[in-house]
């Protein structure tokens, strides 16, 4: 075998330059071949790529290169999700302008990505902070406004009085701002919102069409949209206990069957009835103030101790005027969900049970499990939320839950309160409209002008884009656009009077909700999309990214294609942006902790192995280091590996191969130095193998032989079998399976080369064919090595432009077949026979099996039934 080593440092830049010079990855919009659009979620320009990027973009590149080889017009673009808070933080901490920081990072990361050998169409590159991009985003905002998909409304928001900005629920920790530590206030503020709820049912129903999405992602979206069928119930308020002007309390419930188990009503701290109660009760007012200081994240509310205060108000049970229910203000009820009010049935809801146990309100079970004695069925610390029959429920007793729900609905639909039905069937959604206003500088400006005479005025299309000013200061807290001395002061386009710009910018999720459509024609200066192009190139056939984006980004993108359709910018099948979605696992690594408790990086560690024991020591000084758990690579744990170091040491192809080979792509991959070294050894083995095969390939006859001997036929069957299996694995995104088949076939070819010092013409031809196939098989994963091998084999052009070899189906048919064997109905073994063996030969082979003889126990064989190509049954 050849001893020549493959030099990745020389090879990889050379081939990257050749690809770039030939522009082989540029996609033509007028190409009439069938399109294939593969896209990885574009990165935020933090300044450095990490190994997660390497894994993500390698997967997409394998798909892109394979589909290009299969004759598709492949669109595989790259851009930058470039707006966001980190750029402003950099401006504050490092005294560098957000724009400069962002574009410097883009340049650095682009250079890193280019060393990976990705088959990207860089001509389509853009950053979402480019005015040429957000001009069209502003245009779509105005178009959405025209068709009723944008509104301005007042919302209660988390306000950080130190940073002077609105915080997301998740940014409020123990009632304080995550960054400033200030006590957060709930403020009612104007917000621009996208009316995503108009599409709630459509977004839910269309999940059933996304059969190439992971089930877990569809389930997460289904739960987020949260469709529930229930009853809107109007509870009359006892006038003797209620503030003037308040007459009823509306609640939405999915469990009207449990009304006879009600023990209390609960309302949100900002419910109008709570405000009315607070005006007359200082203790209620104090409790409400305390609620406003608590975190508003759903997870925090779910885990916090359930607390409330009795307002003194009483609600009247809809089926019994004498039954009065206390109305509490509770810290677990949110105004944003339902009506901001609930009735509590503690026996069948754990949250309600915790509440009544705290305040000693008692509970009455109204659903009894089948087989339980209703007289002895009690609830203490654990609520029962299963099926059963109604008890303690008057006219509902004995009914199933479904029957009881229907009966309650029918009765309340006919009952009247103030001239209207007490109950009405209603479909409710957990999904809320998308508030996009952010009090930040580094985001897409909202194209609105506020005029004291004309009120809200859209910026005229001719004045787009509204460009961010660059001469901003971050010396003061809050939004730098608010502080700018000139930028916000404008003339009203309607009346010509003095006016001010909207200083809120758009949520950065808006930027990433349509970028995939812009990639289809980023050169269009007049409109966000070119309809005939976007309608032909969309949807994205394969989208790849992290499961952390399963809800917001993916749901907002699904909304955006529908909104863009309503505004005339796109019209695609099912209105879905991503036909196929794949969520890859993370890259994880051991953690290492020094004696002082601080983490050490892998680069600082030496690992020794003694038997089954692994020990870690510091390279500097040799001090022992504790080997900790395997965790996601992160800067805080210092368990990251720099892609530049790996690519610089081993080459991009080695990094790409390792990232694909270690584990199924939807699972986490454990970073291992030994695994990387193993991938590097395989690269060298392939290089030597191709160099060994090259002289034989050169001596092979140009014409295909009329027939093939046994050795040549065996090799050709292995080659075409590998073609079929590797392609199948890539189509299923089972990259590790494809790589295993490549390894297996390389072993077969290596064995053939070792036995073929002077091969016959037919075997030489088969070796040449098989070696060329091997190179094409590993080309999507290791493209630089493949190009070098392609040249060694004397092939013309670039392997990156070569078509996938045709698979000869007759070579996929196995000469033998393995059939299960049953004796008297029980499986006793298998038999392998020639595929075309006659029945008599199969019978003889079966009866010769020791397991069959043992099963018969000396009894005579009555008959042998051979089901061709399926099974053999022996009856004794």
From Swiss-Prot:
Annotated positions binding ATP: 635
InterPro entries reported in the protein's UniProt record: aa-tRNA-synth_I_CS, aa-tRNA-synth_Ia, Leu-tRNA-ligase, Leu_tRNA-synth_edit, M/V/L/I-tRNA-synth_anticd-bd, Methionyl/Leucyl_tRNA_Synth, Rossmann-like_a/b/a_fold, tRNAsynth_Ia_anticodon-bd
Entry's localization field: Cytoplasm
Motif ('KMSKS' region): 632-636
EC number: 6.1.1.4
Coiled-coil stretches: none
Principal place of residence: cytoplasm
GO molecular function, one term: leucine-tRNA ligase activity
Keywords for the protein's UniProt record, in alphabetical order: Aminoacyl-tRNA synthetase, ATP-binding, Cytoplasm, Ligase, Nucleotide-binding, Protein biosynthesis
Catalytic activity: tRNA(Leu) + L-leucine + ATP = L-leucyl-tRNA(Leu) + AMP + diphosphate
Gene Ontology process terms (BP): leucyl-tRNA aminoacylation
Top-level class of the enzyme under EC nomenclature: ligase
Motif ('HIGH' region): 43-53
GO CC annotation, single: cytosol
NCBIfam families according to UniProt: leuS_bact
HAMAP family listed in its UniProt record: Leu_tRNA_synth_B
PANTHER family: LEUCINE--TRNA LIGASE, MITOCHONDRIAL (PTHR43740:SF2), LEUCYL-TRNA SYNTHETASE (PTHR43740)
The family this protein is said to belong to: Belongs to the class-I aminoacyl-tRNA synthetase family.
Name of the protein: Leucine--tRNA ligase
Species, as recorded: Rhodopseudomonas palustris (strain ATCC BAA-98 / CGA009)
Taxonomic lineage from the root: Bacteria, Pseudomonadati, Pseudomonadota, Alphaproteobacteria, Hyphomicrobiales
Gene name linked to the record: leuS
């Amino acid at each position: 075998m050849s001893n020549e080593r493959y030099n990745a440092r020389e090879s990889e830049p050379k081939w990257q330059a050749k690809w770039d010079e030939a522009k082989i990855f540029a996609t033509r919009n007028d190409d009439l071949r069938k399109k294939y659009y593969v896209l990885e979620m574009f990165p935020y320009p933090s300044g450095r790529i990490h190994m997660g990027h390497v894994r993500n973009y390698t997967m997409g590149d394998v798909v892109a290169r394979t589909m290009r080889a299969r004759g598709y017009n492949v669109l595989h673009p790259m851009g930058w999700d470039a707006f966001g808070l980190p750029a402003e933080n950099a401006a504050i901490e490092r005294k560098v302008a957000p724009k400069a920081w962002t574009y410097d990072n883009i340049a650095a990361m682009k250079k890193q990505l280019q060393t990976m050998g990705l088959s990207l169409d860089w001509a389509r590159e853009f950053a979402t902070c480019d005015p040429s991009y957000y001009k069209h985003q502003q245009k779509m905002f105005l178009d959405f406004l025209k068709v009723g998909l944008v509104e301005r409304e007042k919302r209660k928001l988390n306000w950080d009085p130190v940073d002077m900005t609105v915080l997301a629920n998740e940014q409020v920790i123990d009632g304080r701002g995550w960054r400033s530590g200030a006590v957060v206030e709930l403020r009612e503020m104007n917000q621009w919102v996208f009316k995503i709820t108009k599409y709630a049912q459509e977004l839910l129903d269309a999940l059933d069409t996304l059969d190439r999405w992971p089930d877990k992602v569809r389930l997460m979206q289904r739960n987020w949209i949260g469709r529930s069928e229930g009853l809107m119930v109007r509870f009359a308020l006892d006038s003797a206990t209620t503030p003037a002007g308040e007459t009823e309390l509306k609640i939405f419930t999915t469990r009207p069957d449990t009304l006879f188990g009600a023990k209390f009503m609960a309302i949100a701290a900002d419910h109008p009835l709570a405000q009315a109660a607070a005006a007359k009760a200082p203790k209620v007012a104090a409790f409400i103030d305390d609620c406003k200081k608590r975190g508003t994240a759903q997870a925090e509310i779910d885990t916090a101790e359930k607390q409330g205060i009795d307002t003194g108000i009483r609600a009247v049970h809809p089926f019994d005027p004498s039954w009065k229910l206390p109305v509490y203000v509770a810290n677990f009820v949110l105004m944003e969900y339902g009506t901001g009010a609930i009735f509590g049935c503690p026996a069948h809801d754990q949250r309600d049970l915790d509440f009544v146990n705290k305040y000693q309100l008692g509970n009455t079970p109204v659903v009894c499990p089948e087989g339980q004695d209703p007289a002895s069925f009690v609830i203490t610390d654990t609520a029962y939320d299963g099926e059963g029959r109604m008890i303690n429920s008057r006219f509902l007793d004995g009914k199933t839950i479904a029957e009881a729900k229907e009966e309650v609905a029918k009765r309340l639909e006919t009952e009247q309160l103030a001239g209207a039905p007490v109950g009405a069937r209603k479909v409710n959604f957990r999904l809320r409209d998308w508030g996009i206003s952010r009090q930040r500088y580094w985001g897409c400006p909202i194209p609105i002008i506020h005029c004291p005479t004309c009120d809200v005025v859209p910026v005229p299309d001719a004045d787009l884009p509204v460009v961010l000013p660059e001469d901003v200061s971050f010396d003061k807290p809050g939004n730098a656009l608010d502080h700018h001395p000139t930028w916000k002061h404008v003339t009203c386009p309607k009346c010509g009077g003095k006016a001010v710009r909207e200083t809120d910018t758009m949520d950065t999720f808006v930027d990433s909700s349509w970028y995939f459509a812009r990639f289809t024609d980023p050169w269009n200066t007049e409109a966000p999309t070119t309809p005939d192009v976007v309608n032909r190139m969309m949807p994205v056939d394969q989208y790849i990214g992290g499961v952390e984006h399963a809800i917001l980004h993916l749901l907002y993108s699904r909304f955006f294609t529908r909104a863009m359709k309503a505004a005339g910018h796109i019209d695609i099948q099912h209105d879905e942006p991503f036909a196929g979605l794949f969520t890859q696992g993370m890259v994880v690594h051991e953690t290492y902790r020094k004696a002082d408790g601080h983490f050490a990086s892998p680069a600082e560690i030496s690992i020794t192995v003694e038997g089954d024991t692994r020990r870690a020591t510091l390279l500097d000084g040799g001090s022992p280091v504790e080997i900790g758990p395997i965790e996601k690579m992160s800067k805080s744990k210092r368990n990251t590996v720099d892609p530049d170091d790996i690519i610089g040491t081993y080459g991009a192809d080695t990094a790409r191969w390792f990232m694909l080979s270690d584990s199924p792509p939807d699972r986490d991959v454990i970073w291992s130095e030994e695994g990387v070294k193993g991938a590097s050894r395989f690269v060298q083995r392939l290089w030597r193998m191709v160099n060994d095969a090259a002289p034989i390939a050169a001596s092979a006859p140009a014409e295909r032989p009329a027939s093939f001997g046994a050795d040549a036929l065996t090799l050709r069957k292995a080659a075409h079998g590998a073609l079929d299996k590797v392609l199948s694995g890539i189509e299923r995104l089972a990259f590790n399976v494809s790589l295993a088949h490549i390894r297996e076939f390389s072993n077969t070819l290596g064995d053939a080369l070792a036995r073929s010092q002077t091969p016959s013409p037919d075997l030489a031809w088969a070796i040449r064919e098989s070696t060329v196939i091997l190179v094409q098989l590993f080309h999507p994963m290791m493209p630089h090595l493949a190009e070098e091998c392609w040249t060694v084999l004397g092939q013309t052009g670039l392997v990156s432009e070569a078509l996938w070899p045709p698979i000869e189906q007759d070579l996929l048919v196995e000469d033998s077949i393995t059939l299960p064997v049953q004796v008297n109905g029980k499986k006793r073994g298998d038999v392998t026979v020639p595929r075309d063996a006659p029945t008599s030969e199969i019978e003889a082979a079966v009866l010769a099996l020791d397991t069959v003889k043992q099963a018969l126990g000396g009894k005579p064989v009555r008959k042998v039934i051979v089901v061709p190509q399926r099974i053999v049954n022996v009856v004794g």
